[in-house]
Swiss-Prot record, chains A, B, C, D, E, F:
Cystines in this chain: none
Pfam entry (one): DUF34_NIF3
Protein's name in the database: GTP cyclohydrolase 1 type 2 homolog
Coiled coil: none
Protein residues bound to a divalent metal cation 2: 66, 230, 234
Source organism: Streptomyces coelicolor (strain ATCC BAA-471 / A3(2) / M145)
Lineage of the species this protein comes from: Bacteria, Bacillati, Actinomycetota, Actinomycetes, Kitasatosporales
Amino acid sequence: MPRLSEVITALDALWPAERAESWDAVGTVVGEPDQEVSRVLFAVDPVQETVDEAVGLGADLLVTHHPLYLRGTTTVAASTFKGRVVHTLIKNDIALHVAHTNADTADPGVSDALAGALDLNVVRPLVPDPSDPEGRRGLGRVCELTHPLTVRELAARAAERLPATAQGIRVAGDPEATVRTVAVSGGSGDSLFDHVRAAGVDAFLTADLRHHPVSEARAHNPLALLDAAHWATEWPWCELGAAQLDEISDRHGWDLRVHVSKTVTDPWTAHVASAPTSSAMGAPN
Amino acid sequence: MPRLSEVITALDALWPAERAESWDAVGTVVGEPDQEVSRVLFAVDPVQETVDEAVGLGADLLVTHHPLYLRGTTTVAASTFKGRVVHTLIKNDIALHVAHTNADTADPGVSDALAGALDLNVVRPLVPDPSDPEGRRGLGRVCELTHPLTVRELAARAAERLPATAQGIRVAGDPEATVRTVAVSGGSGDSLFDHVRAAGVDAFLTADLRHHPVSEARAHNPLALLDAAHWATEWPWCELGAAQLDEISDRHGWDLRVHVSKTVTDPWTAHVASAPTSSAMGAPN
Amino acid sequence: MPRLSEVITALDALWPAERAESWDAVGTVVGEPDQEVSRVLFAVDPVQETVDEAVGLGADLLVTHHPLYLRGTTTVAASTFKGRVVHTLIKNDIALHVAHTNADTADPGVSDALAGALDLNVVRPLVPDPSDPEGRRGLGRVCELTHPLTVRELAARAAERLPATAQGIRVAGDPEATVRTVAVSGGSGDSLFDHVRAAGVDAFLTADLRHHPVSEARAHNPLALLDAAHWATEWPWCELGAAQLDEISDRHGWDLRVHVSKTVTDPWTAHVASAPTSSAMGAPN
Amino acid sequence: MPRLSEVITALDALWPAERAESWDAVGTVVGEPDQEVSRVLFAVDPVQETVDEAVGLGADLLVTHHPLYLRGTTTVAASTFKGRVVHTLIKNDIALHVAHTNADTADPGVSDALAGALDLNVVRPLVPDPSDPEGRRGLGRVCELTHPLTVRELAARAAERLPATAQGIRVAGDPEATVRTVAVSGGSGDSLFDHVRAAGVDAFLTADLRHHPVSEARAHNPLALLDAAHWATEWPWCELGAAQLDEISDRHGWDLRVHVSKTVTDPWTAHVASAPTSSAMGAPN
Amino acid sequence: MPRLSEVITALDALWPAERAESWDAVGTVVGEPDQEVSRVLFAVDPVQETVDEAVGLGADLLVTHHPLYLRGTTTVAASTFKGRVVHTLIKNDIALHVAHTNADTADPGVSDALAGALDLNVVRPLVPDPSDPEGRRGLGRVCELTHPLTVRELAARAAERLPATAQGIRVAGDPEATVRTVAVSGGSGDSLFDHVRAAGVDAFLTADLRHHPVSEARAHNPLALLDAAHWATEWPWCELGAAQLDEISDRHGWDLRVHVSKTVTDPWTAHVASAPTSSAMGAPN
Amino acid sequence: MPRLSEVITALDALWPAERAESWDAVGTVVGEPDQEVSRVLFAVDPVQETVDEAVGLGADLLVTHHPLYLRGTTTVAASTFKGRVVHTLIKNDIALHVAHTNADTADPGVSDALAGALDLNVVRPLVPDPSDPEGRRGLGRVCELTHPLTVRELAARAAERLPATAQGIRVAGDPEATVRTVAVSGGSGDSLFDHVRAAGVDAFLTADLRHHPVSEARAHNPLALLDAAHWATEWPWCELGAAQLDEISDRHGWDLRVHVSKTVTDPWTAHVASAPTSSAMGAPN
């Protein structure tokens, strides 16, 4: 059975810490280098729910995409919800390892998993990593559809193929417009509009899009926008990561049990559609 | 018929420029002080669609909540979409006046209109303006429901009473929890969580809520969150502002025709719900 | 007749926007890409006087050296004098295009025109642009006189050859010193003293020189300084620019009428010399 | 005969160091507290010329308005011109004391002396010092003329009453406009335009005015501007300061000999007017 | 037996978190609010040695003066020495609470304990806390000696009364000078020289003094400086804090066992005096 | 006899100013370029004591390692202790030249002299200067011992070989540990721990080490730390520098008398060891 330090070395080889953004907080957050690891759980969010799932599963290592302390903390007291996560992990001898922007840009990375879930053919990174001579690593992916779809059909495929969430998929632009090329980026994508426009794609699927960036993007050009739940766009990476670790485990004869969290940590729990004859002023345009 | 400078003086009395946030960009953006005004259009967004509506209506003055140039510009060339707005306004002798954070905190202001649209009884500002001795001005409103509702029922009321949008209302928290007190804030509200928690309300209705702030808010305490479309939470203020200007016009004998834009400038045009049996992993928790 | 976008493409080829300083604000400020252009006016300052001249002239495009909004604006309301300029331009279908620090460093640029007006032989840029392999572009010019002149004679030539202004030419240093080499830089030049000293010239002609920089420069070494009116040092570029556009127009068969503004927008309107026996304390040293 | 520390205490009472701007560098720059003082020289600039004058005069203390090291130095080596000033002072046992923005705002201060030289009746400070309950201290002065003058006549009075300089007086605005009220501020005044406009005066006399601030001020409103030589606007303060120290000396029985520098350290040494028929384009507007 | 939250409430009453400096990191760092507390250990440093001592002692709560994470951390992995401290604490159900600059300025606080250990009579805070109407709180203490001592005698008393360290006490200034008044400040004190000079004391005892601040302080005035080991100057506060908690425990009937760490965490382990006839150049001056 | 400018040229060749850190303040601080130099004194600190020594010696040039005004000054008034140094130097025609971080990194530099004094064999710079193709220049030195010593023995050698100071040598770590490799850096070295750890040496000798950096360094790994007096670690460079100037003088036939200051300007004047049975709590660990 491998020690934590050995498993971490393998994870670091998949997602090297030095490839994370300077503002990021990746790597091992909790855990003793010499503790033994037999069961691993992959999840998007390091929250009490996924930690409790890890405890229930008897996991020794929880690997998440989101950092626990992005902006640094001076306390892990259990009176804070993040401190309670640390206490639960240490008390149950569960290590926590984070792969965030280093996993976003990896090859394959978060947006490769997202593209795969949507049956999209990856062409190139949306924002290539200048340090990669082969131009495969980078943030987001520019993709082609095998067969053109309307925006509505692409949204329906996303709603069907991504983990179900209360939010579903929001669409901006003509639902009947044709889509042949699409850029995808897991997580918050409203800082990437310049790159998306430069890529000249028909549509852009990402998460956490807000009023002003979307309105201005639409005013710039008729690019269709699809907004899925942040968690749902990054959950596919958990399956990818688990599969990668499985393969490493087999190669090393570690006999690891690698699981993917079934807990939906997307915060939205319900959705109420606008009534078509809302008393205010009329149906959406 | 009043000159633009007289109408602006009246609008400034309702929403004094000095009460806007230091980062904001309120006041008259386009227009000649001496041009005559007979027809006014209120809208949320100063975009080509509402400007074209103003041209079609023969308006002389467009009053919007959102600024045209929040971060300052060195060009109004028509090759930029905002420049085209400026050219359309000037060529058609239409002035543009903005009331943004000075209207947010006004008494009555944007969140009063939002509370009114939802039949909520305003108790106090969520973030009182320290310069107001009477404590009525400020950002957001803390409200009470005449009769308790479940979170789902409150969401349904919002979906029904606010202008219809493709997004509808997203809910985080237990849909069946009871709501007696609710904080509301028009527009992007994810910087107000500390104030909302301090107010001790059961629910918070605002817009543009993203994954991390919502997840962390939910981890803090079981506060229910309702996310409506940014535009829909601020449209009710247009009706309020138009009514206020109507009343001023009568008082001055200006005989102004004051309209409220019917153009839905919320960018979301369609919504596709997650399939309950989405192939990924199962229904929302 | 060419469309504005075609003429702008030509102007951008002369003075590429990317060669402007990062703090600058060059390019098209007002105008519709498809509007037709037959008459163009060159001026230094985008002020009401030159805009009224453009209206009177029936110009379709005003090209100026100084930007209209160097520091960005959130309003173009006609209640502001710059807003009135924008309203006058748009109402009279006159576009505005700015070429500022990109014209300063161009080859030929503002200081070439200034050197030409003074019969000076350009040797090299005072501050070479590192991105120019041929070392011809850059700020200011180091020049040689065909025949040596005294400082007083050089000042007299400047007063005679540059457009007349109330200010005339101020001189610091020994008026009878001999000048063989001179650095010139149109506009405010008091940030260039280190470069001027390094060039080892006998004199430096520029504008907007103030007490402390001049006193310290004089204390450093006996470099003669000639201060002409800011506007007057940059007006020769208008003639150069107009000639360059004329030539382009001929080449394209555009048949453009290209004019140079006759309006003196130097703000100084009068000059009163010190009385030789001023009651205070005596004649200048 | 008083020691330096005693004379400095008296000067600090006139111009307390704590009333200088935070960016300023006032107080004693060179000198031994116990050295005896019998002869004092007042000057505007601490330059080699005024220091040599002090040596020739046998002065023990040089008091100047301008600081020697405004931005701090790490060397006083004589290879630098300011270092040579320090070496000359110390070798000749001459102390140096600076009263700059603390003298600007004093009551009486630099602008009182300037107003006095121009026969103007001081009404109030242009920028009152909030820490002065009596509202007499502050930057610049708002003045009234005993009898109205045209702008040209006021400029002629300034040229006649202020120490003669090669620059003379530059005027912006209608030379024939009538002046009843005028704001004056010794030294560089182009940061005070907002205050001057708020004061509603007919004219503003100061120094070091440059193209853009003057053009924009003139575009704002028809305020006449008079630009004298920086040194000339501050030299009257030397007479005021010398008189004040004389009076203190008498009171203490110090028998000080107090002189005012006759050295014109305004850097401009000659002026050449524009030829009325300058070959370029015509007389000034 | 009290829960941790109750003990923390008592400690917060002694050293309120809001009285810490804004850059500080005080309060509970590890621990579950509901865990029971019967045994408490006070120490200066939250390092592996004191944590091991707490484990050996069966403590439930470790209270330290120095924060564990002053600048915030994004990981508590046991591969880092601070992370190993967190893991040891949580695995052994030991809470960690920090009272740092809020204990420095408390009344009584760190410097009161230091003064007490040295038999000094506290007169007032060296840097009074403006928010304390009674003027008793603040950083450092100004003290009087009951009987004057020479600097050497005071140093000997400090060496004798403070916990023994390899460093002992360094002295700057005349060892035979007389001391009647002394300022003391536990921990690094080289930012307090201005306050110490203003207090006009004969000597200043603190820690972590470096060459340049000491040389410049000595050049300013003949103030004697005594430099003890950082840890030794703050260890007396552990005794004071333990006694205060004991008293609170008695009052609440908590029956707490409160201990003070015996582990010397001063890092210096040996000291070698300069040989009087060191081959370099001679005995100290 | 050489002029000051010639000697400075020679010193600049040894320690080029451009190789100093950007925050540093090296070069000639006082002196007239043409003054003659026959006698030179080297010292660490430009303080009154070494300046008085220079006056007593009849020196013409004082060369120090520490700058006089590191952060720039706006006054050299003799009422300040640094101003008194300037007055004494100028009155006695003594120049002052500083070689600080440019001497630290020179080859040979400050840490070479320190290593030499301790009989250590220099291997390479601790922090190589990237601009040195030969990799010999840089901050600090990594050294080897000819024969291994215990930490205590190395500390004893330092106490014996470096100029005697009241402080002596402080040691952190096991005094009996064996040392084969040691990094040395004259002056304050607590910013170099990362480099020292990366060099993998057994011990690090420097100065001005404080509690927190030393405690954390020790927690990182068992690296032994030796803290000598700041002045003592830099005094050996004076001998090195004097020898280098002697050699230059012979080469130029200048016949310079070059001295090394005997004044100990280390501020510590006495040391009192902790009593082994200090009443507080026991002997050091």
